[in-house]
Amino acid sequence: MIEQTAQALADGKAIGWFQGRMEFGPRSLGGRSILGDPRSEKMQKTLNLKVKYRESFRPFAPSVLREDVSEWFEADYDSPYMLLVDDVKKDKRIKMTKEEESLFGIDKLNIKRSEIPAITHVDYSARIQTVHKKTNPKYHALIAKFKEKTGCSVVVNTSFNVRGEPIVCTPEDAFRCF
């Protein structure tokens, strides 16, 4: 399952990830998540419009292997509950031209700002979830396999629900949602 799911993510597909017990609260932390490839310039818009049925500009959060967080973000600390925000590492950013810097609003949002554009906000920040092998072994294994295939130890992670609905609880909910 890990191999096939990591390959589907690497191929640009959005995945409904359902494992173990359901999280309680507003964030999906790898138990009930919709996942995508953060390297894709189209993933943010695709997930928002075709999966979540919400405005195309709404940002997504990254799940990153704890041992690799400082490779992708200015952070080097634990954030297992997706509560902390930090900037994408400077060497992962793409410098904007003067013309791009002068853009405003939705036009600025459509500019690729980093190697992981699907989770990079306009100010280069992201709300990070660090994934630990000991506390979330299956999700960690998935991200590690994705890294093996792509060189990227980050995935897009958003709650497994559509606008106005609660996060899925049962397998039946998951099939109905996705």
Model segments located where?
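Flexible beta->alpha loop and helix N-cap segments adjacent to enzyme active/binding sites
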Residues: M1-F178
